[in-house]
Amino acid sequence: MSKIGINGFGRIGRLVLRAAIDKGASVVAVNDPFIDVNYMVYLFKFDSTHGRFKGTVAAEGGFLVVNGQKITVFSERDPANINWASAGAEYVVESTGVFTTIEKASTHLKGGAKKVVISAPSADAPMFVCGVNLDAYKPDMKVVSNASCTTNCLAPLAKVINDNFEIVEGLMTTVHATTATQKTVDGPSGKLWRDGRGAAQNIIPAATGAAKAVGKVIPALNGKLTGMAFRVPTPNVSVVDLTVRLGKGASYDEIKAKVQEAANGPLKGILGYTDEEVVSTDFLSDTHSSVFDAKAGISLNDKFVKLISWYDNEFGYSNRVIDLIKYMQSKD
């Protein structure tokens, strides 16, 4: 398997490393200009949300050493200056949240990276969602996006529903856990005034492009879905509410059966299914992109339904970053 570099050792960067270890992928380099290697050890070892790292982690001679494997550490602010080639990194995960366009992410190629995977939606890079549109990947693509955690939750469910019952139109709401861009107390937040309100005190209506992005990965749904978010005071795990009008009438039991069929078949490991009495913390560190909650959904009639699906917005997504890289490697 080709070797991976990670740019930005924040929530996603660190969890991509955990996911890589779980999946037997090789991370050989990490770049972060804001934390030194000793701080990396601390942040990787202790995690308030997912718990302590179960393996060994140490700093030795400037390297980050995880489970005995040496990882080269860079501290460059400009991606063009990161010497990925010296560490043997071919696939770079761009997880700073800053370099999200083809132009900006392409600077990694100057340092020897062969491919770049942006761990965020991108304005112009081709977007991929595992289980949905990987067949559209072409080896000549140098920079790709793994879309957003919410698009990764919504798209597999929307695919199953559209393939079987045809989505005429729909609205999505994500009830979304707090993320690092939010404020601990009220503060200025540019043009998005509500986003600057205290995260622990409020339910905050917010914009999200996740539903519209589904139209990019499932062209048949382009223009048929849009959505919004509520940011809520929980540290992790979010839930999508997809309310759709169907072209082909179906009972809620028929819908459940098709989702379960996909979860046990072509979308196994990506789309999950539960009929238990679950709540958000039951999905902490869940590796699925999306877990359909059979007991939470409702049907008004055979053509108008509300479907509910949970996701660990940090760890499920980080696992898909590695899955996307593995898929790319199989085709390159």
UniProtKB/Swiss-Prot annotation:
Q: What UniProt keywords are attached to this protein's entry?
A: Cytoplasm, Glycolysis, NAD, Oxidoreductase
Q: Which GO terms describe its cellular component?
A: cytosol
List S-S links within the chain. none
Per the record, the GO terms for biological process are: glucose metabolic process; glycolytic process
Q: Tell me the InterPro entries matching this sequence.
A: GlycerAld/Erythrose_P_DH (IPR020831), GlycerAld_3-P_DH_AS (IPR020830), GlycerAld_3-P_DH_cat (IPR020829), GlycerAld_3-P_DH_NAD(P)-bd (IPR020828), Glyceraldehyde-3-P_DH_1 (IPR006424), NAD(P)-bd_dom_sf (IPR036291)
Q: Where is this site: Activates thiol group during catalysis?
A: H176
- Residues engaged in binding NAD(+): R11, I12, D32, R77, N313
**Positions annotated as active site in the UniProt record:** C149 (nucleophile)
The catalytic activity, as recorded, is:
D-glyceraldehyde 3-phosphate + phosphate + NAD(+) = (2R)-3-phospho-glyceroyl phosphate + NADH + H(+)
Q: Give the EC number(s) listed in the UniProt record.
A: 1.2.1.12
- First and last residue of the signal peptide: none
Ligand binding (D-glyceraldehyde 3-phosphate) = S148, C149, T150, T179, T208, G209, R231
Q: Which GO terms describe its molecular function?
A: glyceraldehyde-3-phosphate dehydrogenase (NAD+) (phosphorylating) activity; NAD binding; NADP binding
- Give the main location: cytoplasm
Q: Where in the cell is it found?
A: Cytoplasm
**Hey, which pathway is this one from?**
Carbohydrate degradation; glycolysis; pyruvate from D-glyceraldehyde 3-phosphate: step 1/5
- Subunit structure of this chain's protein: Homotetramer.
* Family under the similarity heading: Belongs to the glyceraldehyde-3-phosphate dehydrogenase family.
What is the recorded name of this protein? Glyceraldehyde-3-phosphate dehydrogenase 2
